[in-house]
Every structure is written in C-alpha cells, then in structure tokens.
C-alpha cells in the first residue's frame, strides 16, 4: 500500500467508528494549497456548515491558504458557523491525516471558539 491508500484506510476506520456513535462530525480535508472543514450530520448525508480557505473573505485576508495560520482561521470560522447552526459537540474526523501542524491548528482554534470534541 502506498501513503495515500494507507491514509484513506485510516479515514474509513475513523468514519465507521463515528457512524457507530451517531454523532455530528467535523470533517477536515487538506491539500497543499488549501484546507476545508465541514460539519456533517449523523447520517452522513447533509452538510450543516462549512468553511474553507477558498472563501472570498478568507482568501482576501490570507496570502496562502495552505499554512497553519489559514487553518486556525478556518477553525475559528467553522466553530462560529456551527454555533450559529446550534451545534456544540462534534466528533473530529481528520480524514486519516496526522494530528499535527494544520490539523492541530484547526482543531485548537475550533475548540477555543466553542466546539467540544
């Protein structure tokens, strides 16, 4: 197995565990250039809130959407949008990525602004 397949296998296992818990999940995806976060309902069928470094106001404020600072901004935005939608507690789905760097920055910012996970 190569690196990507290993990451995707980890992601499937994590999502299966979250599905058993029947919890709303905070799903995060990253690329070299951008970071994306979505709040997905218990069934996995509906996106309740989303934020990404591609949004116009984030893009104008940040020169680079693929760094730790951008991840922290996205964490703050997703927490604000989730609270506006009435969501306080989520399960963190890091999509198989290591909890380090941008993932950690996004998670810490989301926790600071009120999300519980």
From Swiss-Prot:
Q: Name one GO molecular function term.
A: 5S rRNA binding
Keyword annotations of the record: Ribonucleoprotein, Ribosomal protein, RNA-binding, rRNA-binding
The UniProt entry, under InterPro entries, shows: Ribosomal_uL18_bac-type, Ribosomal_uL18_bac/euk
> GO annotations under biological process?
translation
Q: Name one GO cellular component term.
A: cytosolic large ribosomal subunit
Could you name the domain of life of the organism this protein comes from? Bacteria
Main role?
This is one of the proteins that bind and probably mediate the attachment of the 5S RNA into the large ribosomal subunit, where it forms part of the central protuberance.
How does this polypeptide assemble, per the annotation? Part of the 50S ribosomal subunit; part of the 5S rRNA/L5/L18/L25 subcomplex. Contacts the 5S and 23S rRNAs.
Family as reported in the entry's similarity comment: Belongs to the universal ribosomal protein uL18 family.
Entry protein name: Large ribosomal subunit protein uL18
**Organism listed in the record:** Chromobacterium violaceum (strain ATCC 12472 / DSM 30191 / JCM 1249 / CCUG 213 / NBRC 12614 / NCIMB 9131 / NCTC 9757 / MK)
């Amino acid at each position: 197995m190569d690196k990507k397949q290993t990451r995707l296998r980890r992601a499937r296992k994590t999502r299966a565990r979250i599905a058993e818990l029947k919890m709303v999940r905070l799903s995060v995806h990253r690329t070299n250039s951008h970071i994306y976060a979505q709040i997905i309902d218990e069934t996995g069928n509906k996106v309740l809130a989303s934020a990404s470094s591609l949004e116009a106001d984030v893009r104008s404020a940040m020169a680079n959407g693929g760094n730790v600072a951008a991840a922290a901004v996205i964490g703050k935005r997703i927490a604000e949008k989730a609270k506006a939608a009435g969501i306080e507690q989520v399960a963190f789905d890091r999509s198989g990525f290591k909890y380090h760097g941008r993932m950690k920055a996004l998670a810490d910012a989301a926790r600071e602004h009120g999300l519980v996970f």
